[in-house]
Amino acid sequence: IKKDMPTVSHEIGQWCVYPDFKEIQKYTGVLKAKNFEIFQETLAEKHLSDLADEFLYASGRLQTLCYKADIEAALRTPGFAGLQLLDLHDFPGKGTALVGDLKPFWESKGYVEGEEYSMFCNQTVPLARLPKMVYLNNESMKAPLEFAHFGAEPLKSASIYWKLADKKGTILQSGSWTKDLPVTNSIWIGNMVCDLSSVQTPQELILTAGIEGTKVHNEWHIWVYPAEEKKITNAPYMTNVFDQQAIDRLEKGENVLLCVSRGALRPEKGGNIKVGFSSIFWNTAWTNKQAPHTLGIYCNPSHPALSLFPTEKYSDYQWWDIVSDCEAIVMDDFPAEYRPVVHLIDDWFTNRKLGLLFEAKVGKGKLMVCGADLLKPENGRMARRQFKQSILNYMTSDRFAPTTTLSVEEI
């Protein structure tokens, strides 16, 4: 590449989303969505049809997060001339490449709209260089703010603002600058700094930056957890092995937390499933099962096991520490109506019922099983520590009351 030749990224992203089976009825001509019909049938065989739209939405939110990360990385790169997506809609061929934010018919899939997308993919984009997305409340957030501006002409004396607020809209800190924005990227604005000591409970915060009097703005979500780890009294028995000691404790009516070690599952029980934070690239049929094999998590955010781990029903960055180092547990042999606390959304070619976290009554006791090994050293993974804290808080409360009974053999 010549020194003065513009460099543009080619077909970045290609992050997949779960199929939207409502599209099937739109194929009224010579082309039929037989692939979707097969995927729909295999989902029904696993008794998960009622979750099809939930899987679409949850995986779609992760897809949007992945595209946002890729696009912002390109816009932050000094001297970079631009980026190209394959398309905004799905590519139905080559193994079924569900990489679009839109249906093949240029219609919304319901999980992201143009207004949100334009925050990070536009001619003028605020860009935060966040060093991390998870903080403790004895830290300060410090994030440099830059702009990429590729409008028709420079912006003179732009009134730039930023704020960090909680989900209720209460502003923790804010700031402003007046800056000229030339036609380029890597335009330095200033540092966004906020002491986080006022955040006394686990919270999701929203960092926003933009230009006053315009639609130009962008936002990022961060998570803040207490630095002091709460002591758990009457903690359950915790183990990596479902051995006779664990069984005996359950038979006596105790609570047990079973954390699956990496590589501990047989292939048919999930050992051959590669879990990652991102969505599937292109599709596994075309890439010969290139990892990852999953499409993020799906959960009920109001489940009491997650009360100290703020989340939506889909993956966001607080899940990175957990799903990037976990096993997917195949639960196809469990009762048809059984649902885990936290699902891992499987590849649509296999449509297995996958669990990351699930609970059951076993013997006289109660069991919680986690596909992430929460017993090994944290090594700075504060989100994983908080996830464990939330689970233990739940298991030591009277809210821990699984409704499904499983036998030792089923476990």
Where would I find each of the regions flagged by the language model?
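Catalytic beta-strand/loop cores that center a nucleophilic Ser/Cys/Thr
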Residues: I1-K3, R262-P267, N283-M382, R399-I411
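Substrate-binding clefts and catalytic carboxylate motifs of secreted carbohydrate-active enzymes
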Residues: I1-L164, P340
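Flexible loop/turn segments at secondary-structure boundaries
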Residues: W15-V17, D90-T96, I171, Q245, ...
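Beta-strand-rich interaction surfaces with strong enrichment in secreted/lumenal proteins
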Residues: P131-M133, S176-P182, D195-S197
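Beta-strand-rich binding/interaction modules
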Residues: N138-D180, I189-V193, P202-E212
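Short beta-strand elements
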Residues: K179-P182, K215-K231
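Short alpha-beta junction capping motif
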Residues: N234-N283, K364, C370, I391
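Short amphipathic C-terminal alpha-helix that caps PH/PH-like domains
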Residues: A383-T396
